[in-house]
């Protein structure tokens, strides 16, 4: 049996190690801009997660990666931040990061992660999502600039990483912490067990 994480995120890799060391990383090369942003955020993140899992399946099929394996399970995941129904993905540059963090300052936002686990041999997929509410304290303009200067905002939905220097912005959290980091591990664990994956 092979377990494949379809993500290059070091944070997701570390979280997955909490339940198993027996997996490999084959990052998805799926272009997220191909999926139209939807107001139905739950469906949107699940479609992104499914697309990433299927993209990785295409990669490993073309490389005869799993021809000798009885079972291959591919984990796709995508995380976005939402405030007032608007999706905040990964910032393109420092200005966009500044705009995002200014908008989140002193307010409550939601973090959504979509999960998709693809059984490559049976061509069966299970999808789900998780939502966590996060409340930020008021953050001064100078503090935001200092945070952006450290570079941690890059490649993170909503321009922050809760597990890093931005942890001081967080006043309250309702729901899964690991979901905010990028991989709702409890939900993933249940999906894998339900699909017969022996962890």
From Swiss-Prot:
It catalyses: dTTP + H2O = dTMP + diphosphate + H(+); UTP + H2O = UMP + diphosphate + H(+). The record marks 11, 79, 163 as: Important for substrate specificity. It is found in: Cytoplasm. Its main location: cytoplasm. Belongs to the Maf family. YhdE subfamily. Nucleoside triphosphate pyrophosphatase that hydrolyzes dTTP and UTP. May have a dual role in cell division arrest and in preventing the incorporation of modified nucleotides into cellular nucleic acids. This is dTTP/UTP pyrophosphatase. It comes from Clostridium acetobutylicum (strain ATCC 824 / DSM 792 / JCM 1419 / IAM 19013 / LMG 5710 / NBRC 13948 / NRRL B-527 / VKM B-1787 / 2291 / W).
